[in-house]
Amino acid sequence: MTDTLKLGVPKGSLQNATIELFKRSGWKINVHSRNYFPDINDAEINCAICRAQEMSIYVENGTLDAGLTGKDWIAENQSDVHVVTDLVYSKVSSRPARWVLAVAGDSPVKTLEDLQGAKIATEMVGFTKRYFAERGIDVEVEFSWGATEAKVVSGLADAIVEVTETESTIRAHGLRIIKELMQTNTQLIANKKAWEDPFKQKKINQLAMMLKSALVAETLVGLKMNVPEEKADDVIAILPSLNAPTVSHLYKSTWLSVEIVVDVSVVRDLIPQLLEKGAEGIVEYSLNKVMF
């Protein structure tokens, strides 16, 4: 009987981004409607769709061997799991999200202490209660099923603790952020007993390596160019390569072929500079995976 890894894939806002990341990493996950057990092109993995809020619970109790969920929900559930690696991606960006404390724009509240005796709405009830209790501030924390920002506007709460990536929804409701309570990102986690199993640990490490390499590749591009030999030093001097560039002679020519990997953010400024220094035939190409 073939060993298999029981892997949890987050349902909801992270689902599409996670499936796309797996695709770029070499695994194709096919989700069927009204079916929580998608197919995957790997006989050694069995997938299950699970809410990110509950993922760490199922990983901790062994229902799943491993899964992807937010650092925030691991903290909320106080789950005792092995964190394999951080994977910084989300539904809209490649930056960590933030859980923030916010109040109405015209609220007199300026500090945490000003919320003594206040009512706070949030989906992260356990974390929020512990956060204020640790600071000796007595507050009433209520669970919010959604549209949390509207609770302050409608007077149902004095403040909210809500996750944000861009702050656009918070600003749209006229709210003001008092304090950032935590940063969060996706993490690959494993059941501690499963992590001790050689097959499962090897498979989980394979997942971690390939998923991280695909995320790294998102931020980088490759550049290839031809450079006259006499101008090579000038061109190479301005290259912000991860490592030394690859340089080779063109066949029966005094020209060189130069190839580098650079951060995508520098390309728009770098290419004009390369042309000025004498490079020609510059080609930019995307990368699927980058491993260090």
From Swiss-Prot:
Q: Which GO terms describe its biological process?
A: L-histidine biosynthetic process
Recorded hits in InterPro entries, A to Z, give:
ATP-PRT_HisG_long (IPR020621), ATP_PRibTrfase_cat (IPR013820), ATP_PRibTrfase_HisG (IPR001348), HisG_C (IPR013115), N-reg_PII-like_a/b (IPR011322), N-reg_PII/ATP_PRibTrfase_C (IPR015867)
Enzyme class (EC, first level)? transferase
Q: Which UniProt keywords apply?
A: Amino-acid biosynthesis, ATP-binding, Cytoplasm, Glycosyltransferase, Histidine biosynthesis, Magnesium, Metal-binding, Nucleotide-binding, Transferase
Q: List its EC numbers.
A: 2.4.2.17
The family database entries (SUPFAM superfamilies) matched by this protein are listed as: GlnB-like, Periplasmic binding protein-like II
The primary location reported for this protein is cytoplasm
Q: Which reaction does it catalyse?
A: 1-(5-phospho-beta-D-ribosyl)-ATP + diphosphate = 5-phospho-alpha-D-ribose 1-diphosphate + ATP
Per the record's keyword annotation, is Acetylation included, yes or no?
no
- Cofactor(s) the protein requires to work: Mg(2+)
Please summarize the record's notes on activators and inhibitors of this protein: Feedback inhibited by histidine.
Give any GO molecular function from the UniProt entry: ATP binding
Name the source's superkingdom. Bacteria
Residues annotated as coiled-coil are none
Family of this protein: Belongs to the ATP phosphoribosyltransferase family. Long subfamily.
Q: Which HAMAP family does its entry note?
A: HisG_Long
Spell out the protein name for this chain: ATP phosphoribosyltransferase
Which species is listed as the source?
Desulfatibacillum aliphaticivorans
